[in-house]
Amino acid sequence: MQKAQRIIKTYRRNRMIVCTICALVTLASTLSVRFISQRNLNQQRVVQFANHAVEELDKVLLPLQAGSEVLLPLIGLPCSVAHLPLRKQAAKLQTVRSIGLVQDGTLYCSSIFGYRNVPVVDILAELPAPQPLLRLTIDRALIKGSPVLIQWTPAAGSSNAGVMEMINIDLLTAMLLEPQLPQISSASLTVDKRHLLYGNGLVDSLPQPEDNENYQVSSQRFPFTINVNGPGATALAWHYLPTQLPLAVLLSLLVGYIAWLATAYRMSFSREINLGLAQHEFELFCQPLLNARSQQCIGVEILLRWNNPRQGWISPDVFIPIAEEHHLIVPLTRYVMAETIRQRHVFPMSSQFHVGINVAPSHFRRGVLIKDLNQYWFSAHPIQQLILEITERDALLDVDYRIARELHRKNVKLAIDDFGTGNSSFSWLETLRPDVLKIDKSFTAAIGSDAVNSTVTDIIIALGQRLNIELVAEGVETQEQAKYLRRHGVHILQGYLYAQPMPLRDFPKWLAGSQPPPARHNGHITPIMPLR
């Protein structure tokens, strides 16, 4: 008792440490996640803003570029002829302020004014040019002083002729570059070396506020750049973080409390299981399997019982699920393999005698089961036929079917235990190709009743016969059930009608024909327990 109390005291101290660590990690993780997500959100908004502005301006300029190709053939025609097509094109392109035709360096026809005789160099010093240009400048003719964006398209084979389109860029930027606080303090359009700053018109250089960050996106189609200025995603995230502290503290306290509740029993019990394995507190029991026709014992199912000196007999219904949850089911299975081999002398020395051992699907992962069988079973060269009964507590999807094929190659039979009650699927029968289906005792108990399970029992039997799979009925307790199962072609029967689970050392006496003795352990009669 003293040792158990010491274990509990140590566990409680460790439990407090674990819960405190969980709470602190939750606090730090929550704040970190909120900081990172807010920073990413800030950055995403800046990027989306700039990309949206670039995309929209591209959409404006692309039709102008296509339209200028249509207007190039008008160069050289009299303005009286070209004026109407210019006006129609300007009307179609709603963002255009005016379109002009240039020949010999002179703007001679405008969509607004008609005939003109203005040197184009007076409008923009870089015109005419032999290559396409995009420039920001000031309108000196129509709306004097307002910014415009000029797109120049030269005529083929000429450096003094082309189409000049003036775009109402001020209106566009007013819609596209309006700052979005707090992420974006200011935005501007840069073409060549001039900048159109929202709310400030054309400037030759952009202001650089202290502690602000600048983000730029350039168009892949046209020579312009969108500049976005703001306090920066990281700085804003730090500024926003204190508002998340109350929620993070509450969440960390909640996680700490949940961890305290979750570890109250399960962690201590996992320690008990490890201790039980180390001190060999687990004992192997077996339940005979009888041939349905001859009534002769043809095998056993190995069962595990735990006589805990600190808490008394513990049912498999208690320790098996907890062992699975804490990843201790594989060590328990290894223990069963080792003890079965050590006591194999209690079984008939016949290759026709079956020894069934339960394994979890998780044991199939990464070839662990093959390694364990090589170490504990095959190395001893037992004569008896090994049957691995795959339990359905875990999803059978965990089974590595390559391992299943390797087991068949090694002459190990596979059985699906408690078929129809867990995670199995009929489609897996074809993939796994089991040799045996074990009908769960709940279906056996329904025999002779009107319960739905009675119909399911018939379906399982028919399925096994159709697939040529050997059938074992568990939980046979009455002669009526046994007769029904024999009549319907079930090959092997198992249940209290024939024998209760017994320690392995008592099996030879039972097999010799004596009455099944009371199950004992260390001189004490054990309670009757369920098979699982």
UniProtKB/Swiss-Prot annotation:
Record-level GO BP terms: DNA damage response; regulation of single-species biofilm formation
Residue ranges crossing the lipid bilayer per the database entry: 16-36, 245-265
Catalysed reaction equations from the record: 3',3'-c-di-GMP + H2O = 5'-phosphoguanylyl(3'->5')guanosine + H(+)
Subcellular location: Cell membrane
GO molecular function, one term: cyclic-guanylate-specific phosphodiesterase activity
This enzyme's EC code(s): 3.1.4.52
Ranges of residues in domain EAL: 266-515
Induction annotation: Expressed at 28 degrees Celsius in late stationary phase, constitutively expressed at low levels at 37 degrees Celsius, more highly expressed on plates than in liquid medium. Expression is RpoS- and CsgD-dependent.
InterPro entries the UniProt entry points to: CSS-motif_dom, Cyclic-di-GMP_PDE-like, EAL_dom, EAL_sf
Keywords: c-di-GMP, Cell membrane, Hydrolase, Membrane, Transmembrane, Transmembrane helix
Effects seen without this gene: Cells lacking this gene show increased aggregation, increased cellulose production but no increase in surface attachment.
GO cellular component, one term: plasma membrane
Entry membrane topology: Multi-pass membrane protein
Pfam families: CSS-motif (PF12792), EAL (PF00563)
Job description of the protein: Phosphodiesterase (PDE) that catalyzes the hydrolysis of cyclic-di-GMP (c-di-GMP) to 5'-pGpG. May serve as a negative regulator of cellulose synthesis (as has been suggested for S.typhimurium); overexpression inhibits cell aggregation in strains able to produce adhesive curli fimbriae. Cyclic-di-GMP is a second messenger which controls cell surface-associated traits in bacteria.
UniProt name for this protein: Probable cyclic di-GMP phosphodiesterase PdeD
Native species: Escherichia coli (strain K12)
Gene behind this protein: pdeD
